[in-house]
């Protein structure tokens, strides 16, 4: 949002963006790239951080913008950045399985969850991932990745030994609706930064669904390490 001109625009690619003439203060929604999920009974990828920054000062109406890319296989997402007069303003890329990020990645079976809000912002840019298996002998499913609006869901289901396909992947955390801030008229308004669903192992399991706002569903592993 360009104050004074009351113009709302959306930028989905990196580059130097030319705003309305005379623009010196903007309100911006900054959404980073989401992470990839893990393999096997892996945790879901965390959503990229989502921040609504109410007042960014600019030195001119030409603004360098970096739109963070999504993570490659098992990888973290990349930061999104707006370079203001006082320096870069950013949101943090999502955390892959067990990793911290804008929103944290879900846990793989017994590993720790990835923590969200890696940039230590207030209000927070995201949430933690969900938990995985219960004990080392129960390799059931991964937790869901955190979303901008909610933590990732924990894995669950009947308890069983490895290879029995007893687990249910955690759902991805829900995203956040930016429409109240930027209005419904913008083509890119809506819910963003949902977390990825946790994966599950074996044909009788259920993978986690993705969080609202772009989170991808987890997969069911029917082989070894896929």
Q: Residues of each region from the PLM?
A:
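Low-complexity, glycine/proline-biased repetitive segments and flexible coils/loops
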Residues: 1-4, 8-16, 25-226
């Amino acid at each position: 949002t360009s104050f004074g001109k009351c113009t709302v625009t959306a930028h989905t690619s990196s580059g130097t963006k030319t705003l309305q003439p005379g623009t010196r203060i903007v309100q911006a929604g900054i959404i980073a790239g989401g992470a990839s999920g893990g393999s096997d009974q892996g945790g879901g990828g965390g959503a990229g951080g989502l921040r609504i920054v109410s007042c960014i000062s600019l030195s001119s109406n030409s603004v360098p913008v970096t739109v963070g890319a999504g993570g490659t296989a098992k990888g973290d997402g990349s930061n999104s950045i707006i370079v203001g007069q006082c320096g870069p303003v950013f949101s943090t890329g999502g955390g892959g399985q067990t990793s911290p990020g804008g929103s944290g990645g879900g846990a793989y079976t017994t590993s720790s969850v990835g923590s969200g809000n890696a940039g230590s912002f207030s209000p927070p840019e995201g949430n933690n991932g969900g938990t995985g298996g219960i004990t080392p002998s129960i390799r059931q499913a991964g937790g869901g990745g955190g979303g901008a609006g909610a933590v990732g869901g924990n894995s669950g289901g009947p308890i069983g030994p490895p290879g029995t396909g007893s687990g249910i992947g955690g759902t991805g955390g829900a995203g956040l609706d930016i429409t109240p801030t930027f209005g419904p008229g913008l083509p890119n308004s809506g819910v963003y930064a949902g977390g990825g669903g946790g994966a599950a192992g074996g044909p009788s399991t259920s993978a986690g669904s993705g969080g609202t706002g772009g989170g991808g569903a987890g997969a069911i592993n029917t082989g070894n390490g896929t």
